[in-house]
């Protein structure tokens, strides 16, 4: 989710323009590069409007590819680790085809992103579009929304307010968390790469359980929060960790910011936000 307040510093730049547009409708601009990042990515948000979510994934991809075709622009698709579903291979390599539910509550996002990838490859084959496909794993950092709905923001806000930290399931499910600055570097390197379309995993390969993450955040915030456990949602993956061998080889990319530093930066941001 974006926030216009984050762009206040560049609004006066004559080379910068904000255009508010729903990509489920065609867009007519003259353009050189397209970064297709438009889609709700938190389960709380995409499950609230699953039809719009899958339209954004699929119609959005078609419309942005149509724009790229007309303008001969290079286009990057922000795909997701969720295309691997609840993986049977660990860590996940780009060659893994996934184990994804087609009718569960997460399918609007997971299958929407899978379909978008297919459309990108078809446009490349049929229309020779210059495409780039990245698969983003869990990412966090300053400027996340308070109501983002994912574990890092949820846990930090609950800890700063000394409220119970809610874990869904037993907390043994694992994730790997990439700091936003590292992700942005990977995205830029991918867009600038030559003769490489992807797909490529972009994420931090250091794995952690959700329970351990909660405990780290409690310690870093000095919170009196207690951890409580609730029922695990349907189709929630048991583990998620990227194999980034291709990113290292093709992009010379590897995450640099460790979790302790990244969490401290994110905690400071949310602390300031809550106090304001």
List where the protein language model places each region.
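N-terminal Rossmann-like NAD(P)+-binding domain of SDR-like oxidoreductases, especially those catalyzing
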Residues: 1-139, 181, 265, 269-273
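Residues that form or flank phosphate/diphosphate-binding pockets in enzymes
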Residues: 2, 29, 146, 208, ...
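Gly/Ser/Thr-rich beta-alpha loop segments that engage phosphate groups in nucleotides
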Residues: 4, 62, 87, 143-145, ...
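Residue-level signature of the cytosolic catalytic core of signaling kinases
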Residues: 12, 104, 144-148, 206, ...
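C-terminal substrate-binding subdomain of Rossmann-fold SDR/epimerase-dehydratase oxidoreductases
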Residues: 21, 138, 157-276
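Nucleotide-sugar-dependent glycosyltransferase donor-binding/catalytic pocket residues
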Residues: 54, 144-148, 176-179
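Glutamine-centric residue-chemistry signal
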Residues: 77, 126, 144-145, 158, ...
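Conserved donor sugar-nucleotide recognition element shared by glycan-biosynthetic enzymes
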Residues: 108, 116, 148, 210, ...
